[in-house]
Amino acid sequence: MVRSPVSDKFCIPDTLASWPYPRILNPHYAEEKAASAAWTKGFGAFGPKAQDAFDRCDFNLLACLAYPIATPERCRSGCDLMNLFFVIDEHSDTHGEETVRKMKDVVMDAIRNPHKPRPNDEWIGGEIARQFWERAMCYASEISQRRFIDTFDEYLESVVDQAADRDSARIRDIESYINIRRNTIGAKPSFVIMEQGMDIPDNVFENEVFQRLRMATIDMLCLGNDIVSYNIEQARGDDSHNIVRIVMNELDTDVPRAMDWVAQRHTQLEREFFTALSELPTWGEPIDGWVKEYVYGLGNWVRANDQWSFESQRYFGTKGMEIMKSRWLSVLPKVRPAEVGPQLVDQSLL
C-alpha cells in the first residue's frame, strides 16, 4: 500500500456521531468521587507528580458516566473499581511478565480472601483490591460475585500476556490483538457492577444473542479507547498494544488510514449491536427487566467511555472538549516517563 506523506497532525474519527445513547452523569458523582479519590490516594501508590496526574484523569468521572443510575453504594463500587484498574494498569505497564504474574497472584488472592489482611511488605495493589472487594461484594448478588471473580481473573491473565508481549517485543496481528484486547480493556468485570443487584441466570447470560451484544460493546470500547490513547502511547513508546499501531503494522499503512480502518470497523460493530438488540429473546419477569437495564448499561458504556476520554485530562490535558469538536491532534514527540504512574499531557504540543 502507498503511504501518505508523513504529517505532524492526524484526525480522530468521530465514531459515535450517530450513537443514540446520550451522556448521563450519576447524581452521586461529587460525593462518591470525593470518597473514592481520598481512599485511593491514601495508599500512596504513586509519587507526588504521578498522583497529581492520576487525580486529573478522574477515573471516578468514568465510573459515574458508566453507571448513571447506580445507587450511591454501587456508584462507589464503580469508582473504586476504576481506580483499582488504573493502579494496576500503570504499575503493570512498567514491568515484565514475571513481575506482572506475581502482581496478578497478589490481587487475585486478595479478591478471593477479602477479609484476610495483606502482608505489610506486599505490593500495594493487593490491599487496594482487598478493600475494594470487601466493600463492593456486600452489594452484589451471589451470581454477580462469581462472575466478577471469574472475569477479573481473565482480565489479569491478559495483563500478564500483554507483559509477555512487551518482553518479546511482539506485535500481534489484528485478530490475535483483538482477542487479547477484549480482556485487557477490563470491560467484563466492569459490566458486573451493572448487575450487582440482579440474578441473571447463566442460561440467559450465555444466550448467543446476549453474548453478541456484549461482544460488540466490548469491541467498540477497545477501538474507542485505542484511538484516543494512541498519541500519548506512541510518544511513550508503549503503542504495541494499540489497534492503530497493529493495523499500521499488518496493513503496512499510516496513521490516517489506520484510523479510517478503525472507523469502518466501528460502524460495522454498531450494526451488529443493534441487530442483536432486535433479536434479543424474552424470558419473562423479572429477568426481562434485568436484561433491559443491563443492555441499556452496555450501550451507555460506549458513550461514557468516549465522553470521559475528552472530559478528563487523561489523553488531552485541558484541551479535551476542544479536541472532541475539532478531532485534530498534533503528533506528540517521543518522551520517556520519569516515574511509575500517569504523566501530565503537555497540551501545548497537541
Curated annotation (Swiss-Prot):
Gene Ontology biological process terms, A to Z: isoprenoid biosynthetic process
Keyword set for this entry?
Calcium, Cobalt, Lyase, Magnesium, Manganese, Metal-binding, Nickel
Q: Where does Mg(2+) 3 bind?
A: 225, 229, 233
Any known activators or inhibitors?
Ca(2+) switches the cyclization mechanism of delta(6)-protoilludene synthase from 1,11 to 1,10 cyclization which leads to the production of beta-elemene.
The UniProt site entry described as Plays a critical role in the stabilization of intermediate cation is assigned to 86
> Which Pfam families does its entry note?
Terpene_syn_C_2 (PF19086)
- Residue ranges annotated as motif D(D/E)XX(D/E) motif: 89-93
In the UniProt record, does the keyword Disulfide bond occur? Answer: no
Q: Where does (2E,6E)-farnesyl diphosphate bind?
A: 314-315
Gene3D superfamilies recorded for this chain?
A: Farnesyl Diphosphate Synthase
- Entry EC no(s): 4.2.3.-, 4.2.3.135, 4.2.3.198
Query: What's a Gene Ontology MF term here?
Result: terpene synthase activity
UniProt cross-references to InterPro entries, sorted A to Z: Isoprenoid_synthase_dom_sf (IPR008949), Terpene_cyclase-like_2 (IPR034686)
Q: Return the similarity comment.
A: Belongs to the terpene synthase family.
The entry's free-text remark on domains says: The 2 conserved active-site motifs D(D/E)XX(D/E) and NSE are required for coordinating the divalent metal ions that stabilize the PPi moiety of the substrate.
Instruction: Identify the PANTHER family for this entry.
Output: BETA-PINACENE SYNTHASE-RELATED, TERPENE SYNTHASE
Q: What is this protein called?
A: Delta(6)-protoilludene synthase STEHIDRAFT_64702
